[in-house]
UniProtKB/Swiss-Prot annotation:
This is Sulfurtransferase TusD. Pfam families: DsrE (PF02635). It is found in: Cytoplasm. The active site is at C78. Belongs to the DsrE/TusD family. The keyword Ribonucleoprotein does not apply. The keyword DNA damage does not apply. GO terms for molecular function: sulfur carrier activity; sulfurtransferase activity. Heterohexamer, formed by a dimer of trimers. The hexameric TusBCD complex contains 2 copies each of TusB, TusC and TusD. The TusBCD complex interacts with TusE. Gene3D superfamilies: DsrEFH-like. Signal peptide: none annotated. InterPro entries: DsrEFH-like, Sulphur_relay_DsrE/F-like, Sulphur_relay_TusD/DsrE.
Length: 128
């Protein structure tokens, strides 16, 4: 079965993102395909490379990155939601004359078209 996830909660402060990450791990362990994760609203904060959790906490931002690196899962960040919340890549930062960028490697700024495509091409879409 082919899955896609939508994450609307931040990396820290709610259970949404950590529950989504655990669900993603279970999907892959059961032999299913995880096509993509689309981060929307506060969920875009999962892509902020400046996040620095305490040493005894799981680093969820790098956890998502490892999901991409090890399993090829596409990590889409809603570009409009990201820019509103101060998450940007180098290209957008230059275009908007921002002083820096902070998008974690492995994540991609995307439009809602990526979410629509996932809804059309996956068997299940699960929102957290």
């Amino acid at each position: 079965m082919r899955f896609a996830l939508t994450v609307t909660g931040p990396a820290y402060g709610t259970q949404q993102a950590s529950s989504a990450w655990q669900f993603a791990q279970a999907v892959l362990q059961e032999g299913h395909e995880l096509a993509c994760v689309f981060f929307y609203r506060e969920g875009v904060l999962n892509a902020n490379q400046l996040t620095a959790p305490a040493s005894d906490e799981f680093d969820l931002v790098r956890g998502w990155q490892s999901l991409h690196d090890e399993h090829g899962v596409a990590l889409h960040i809603c570009v409009a939601a990201a820019l509103r919340r101060g998450v940007t890549d180098e290209r957008e930062a230059q275009q908007l004359a921002l002083p820096g960028h902070n998008l974690q490697p492995g994540f991609t700024l995307s439009g809602l078209g990526a979410l629509a495509e996932a809804a059309l091409t996956c068997d299940r879409m699960v929102q957290f």
